[in-house]
Regions:
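Glycine/proline-enriched, intrinsically flexible loops and inter-domain linkers
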Residues: 1-285
Length: 285
């Protein structure tokens, strides 16, 4: 309770924050209970062996799919257009090398870390290539960490995608981290275009970044409110070789994630929607 009180004291929306945090704690408790039930029913060794087999199966399946692709080198760039301090471009540069059954994502030529909050750390960077490979190459497979055995990620400490403490990172996930994802997806797509069989499964880039409409103010009773309307979950998917991209597809790494219903938003917050529409031929066209 003391820890919770400390956290809530530092939140502008303590009621929502406490509810969210307690939900996460409850979810962790459910996972622990379900895992204990599995161990009790089948025995710890069997459960551990099945987990290991699942990781190994995914690694083998991805290895075979990578082998079927042509060896080569592909380069891509993505940009972040403002770091919160200066209106200047920061560039994420990627060189993808495919050799045999391994993919190497090299970000070492990316720009140095920024003064503002757009930097990301190494774990955030790693999620970019991982997500791109999962979405493009792992259909019909179990998505798990075994896939990472076929991927190598090179980065330079002190760069925009592998910053050093105390570089600011508050918006890193949706700025440089997202740019690393977009660069990875573009490189994988270009690689697939060079393959005879993989070409028909290639996708263009999805929406380049997420966005959120942040609203705040006071209710009629004087109490404060604040929230983000996560409308970017309705962005379009990348065009495919045989058809347009899906409308309102979500994110490349989280398809069909959706967004808050208009009615729900208006019931919870003092706001009014005049309309919510899809823009023709926008992201995902």
């Amino acid at each position: 309770d003391e820890v919770m009180a400390t956290l809530m004291t530092n939140s502008r929306t303590p009621a929502l924050a406490e509810l969210d945090l307690r939900a996460q704690v409850a979810a962790a408790g459910v996972v622990r209970r379900r895992m204990t039930e599995l161990f009790d029913k089948y025995g710890a060794q069997i459960v551990v062996d099945v987990m290991a087999d699942s990781l190994r199966d995914s690694e083998i399946m991805l290895r075979n799919r990578i082998r079927a692709l042509p060896d080569g080198v592909w380069k891509t760039e993505e940009h972040v257009d403002h770091d919160g301090h200066s209106d200047s471009l920061t560039t994420i540069r990627l060189t993808l090398t495919k050799s045999g059954d391994t993919l190497i994502f090299d970000f070492t030529d990316s720009d140095d870390e920024a003064a503002g909050l757009i930097n990301c750390t190494r774990p955030t960077l790693e999620s970019g290539p991982f997500s791109a490979v999962l979405t493009h190459l792992c259909a019909g497979m179990t998505w798990n960490e075994g896939i990472m055995d076929r991927i190598r990620i090179d980065s330079r400490p002190g760069s925009i995608v592998d910053c050093n403490f105390p570089a600011p990172v508050a918006s890193g996930v949706i700025n440089s981290g997202w740019a690393a994802l977009d660069a990875s997806a573009a490189a994988v797509a270009r690689m697939m275009l060079d393959g005879q069989e993989s070409r028909k499964l290639t996708m263009a880039g999805w929406a380049g970044a997420p966005y959120g409409v942040n609203i705040f103010g006071k209710r009629e009773n004087g109490r404060s409110f604040a929230t983000m309307l996560g409308l970017s979950g309705l962005q379009g998917g990348g065009a495919r070789s045989f058809a347009d991209g899906y409308d309102a597809a979500g994110y490349l790494h989280s398809p069909r994630c959706g967004a808050m219903n208009v009615e729900t938003a208006e019931a919870r917050f003092p706001i009014l929607h005049l309309f919510r529409r899809l823009a023709p031929d926008s992201g995902g066209a």
